[in-house]
Amino acid sequence: MDDEPDVLAVLKEEILSDAPRCILDTATSYEQASELLASWTYDLAIFDIMGVRGFDLLEKAGKRPYPIPVVMLTAHALSPESLKKSIELGARAYLPKERLGAVVPFLEDVMTYEYGAVWRRALKQVEGFFNKTWGAYWKKPDESFWKAFEEKIASRKE
C-alpha cells in the first residue's frame, strides 16, 4: 500500500516477475488499505510509512486475530527513528524504496524465516546503505534500544 502509483507498479512488476501466480491487492490511500485489511486475510503486507499512514496500518495488521507480517517501505520517512518505530510496532522488516530492486529476496526472507532471523538478515542486507545514509554511528542516540533489539534477535532461531 503506497500513495505513489508508480511505486505500486514497480512492486507489482518485481513481485510478479518472480511469482506470477501471486495475488496482489493495492491501495493508494489509508481508507482503501484499511478496508482491504478489514475484508481479507493476507500472507504479507507492504506499507509505505509516510503517505498512507503506514504506522497506523501496521498497528491494525498486528491487532488482527491472525497478525499479518508487515514490511515497512519508505523514502521520505527514511530515518533511524522510523526504523525503530517500525520495530516497536511489530514490523517484520523495513525496506528503503531505493532498494525496490531487491524486494523479492527480501520478501522471501520475511515469508520463510522467523522474526529474529528475518531482522538479522534484513539488517545485514541494508546496513551498508543505512551507514552511508545516516552515518556510521546512527544507533548511538538510542544505543540501549539497539543493544536490546540485537540481543533479542540474536536469541531467536532461524
Predicted segments, located by residue:
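Conserved phosphotransfer cores of two-component systems
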Residues: 38-40, 61-68, 89
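Acidic, metal-coordinating helix/loop segments flanking the phosphotransfer/catalytic sites
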Residues: 12, 26-44, 52
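Conserved phosphotransfer microenvironments
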Residues: 30, 45-64
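Hydrophobic/aromatic residues positioned on beta-strands within the core alpha/beta folds
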Residues: 73-75
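Two-component signal transduction core modules
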Residues: 45, 70, 94-95
